[in-house]
């Protein structure tokens, strides 16, 4: 990943229960959207692309 995504996702996932999984999905979403919401959760309206990405089951993909 890029240093932008790594640093943003490091913050985003700092309190996640499953750190590696959080970082993986955050990284995928960041690469696609070039945006990661601030804070450790919520604030997804800052990044509509990130907010609206869904996985194959139709659930939100991005942490």
Swiss-Prot record:
Disulphide-bonded residues: none
InterPro entries, per the entry: GASA
Keyword terms of this UniProt record: Allergen
UniProt note on tissues of expression: Expressed in peel and pulp of fruit (at protein level).
Any Pfam family matching the protein: GASA
The keyword Protein biosynthesis is assigned to this record: no
Family recorded in the similarity comment: Belongs to the GASA family.
Record's protein name: Peamaclein
Organism from which the protein derives: Prunus persica (Peach)
């Amino acid at each position: 990943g890029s240093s932008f995504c790594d640093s943003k996702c490091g913050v985003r996932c700092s309190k996640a229960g499953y750190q590696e999984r959080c970082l993986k999905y955050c990284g995928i979403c960041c690469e696609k959207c070039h945006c990661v919401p601030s804070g450790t959760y919520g604030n997804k309206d800052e990044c509509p692309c990130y907010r609206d990405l869904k996985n194959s089951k139709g659930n939100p993909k991005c942490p």
